[in-house]
Structure formats: structure tokens, C-alpha cells
Amino acid sequence: KEPEPNLPLFAFIARSIQVLNIMEEGKANFHLCFLLQLCSFLGFSPNMETYRPGYFFDMLNGIFSPSRPIHTYTLDAREAEVFARLTRMDFNNLRHFKFNRGERNAILDRILTYYRLHQPDISELRSPEILRAIFD
């Protein structure tokens, strides 16, 4: 729902589709990488400068914190570490990130929760089931 053309966003999406079409390895993680990179174009990237090992991730405020926030939109220290690693994933290295189906589904659920928190106009998506089927 952009009021004017967003050329960087369009270029990112076009490039992503091109990469997916030629990708030979790592396709199972493509959707995770795409969604995390898309955050920056939509204006709600996690603040990685606040990350430290053992910190919680406050999904509501997009920051890492040494103490658990009082709301429930939090990743514990282990999940926060995985999330921090994921933010370093790009289309060139995503084949090196190994997750089983359950881990990938849990990560997708967390990313979609993060999206809903920062884009309240996003209704419940039906696409997670499609993404799980395609990238499994």
C-alpha cells in the first residue's frame, strides 16, 4: 500500500525471483531469507547492534535485551541467537544454514509474528501453509 513507486523494493523483489529461479542449493531457506531481508524495505528491521549472546529478543520493539520484556512477544536467549544468525543469511550463503522441517516451520512462525507486530494491517496469512509445502 505504497503511495508512490518504491523502486528499491521492486528491484529487491525482482532480484529475489531471479535468484530463486537459478538457485540450485538452499531453496528450503529461501522464504526465510526473503522475509527477513524484506523487513528492511518495510522499515522494521531488527536492531542488530543491540544483540549480545544470552540476550532476549523483544519482537515488539525490534531490539535485543538482557532481561525478558514484560510482554509475551519475546524470543528466549536460544531462539534469539538463532534469529540473530538468520539476519546474516543472504541469497549467497543460505545453503549453509541447515534446518529440519520443524525448525524451519518454527522460524517461519516467529518471522510472521514479527511481521504482524510491525504491520498491523496484515491479516492472518494463508500463505504459511503454501510456503511450508513449497520450501519443504
What are these regions (language model features)?
Residues 1-136:
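Non-catalytic alpha-helical scaffolds and adjoining flexible linkers that form interface surfaces
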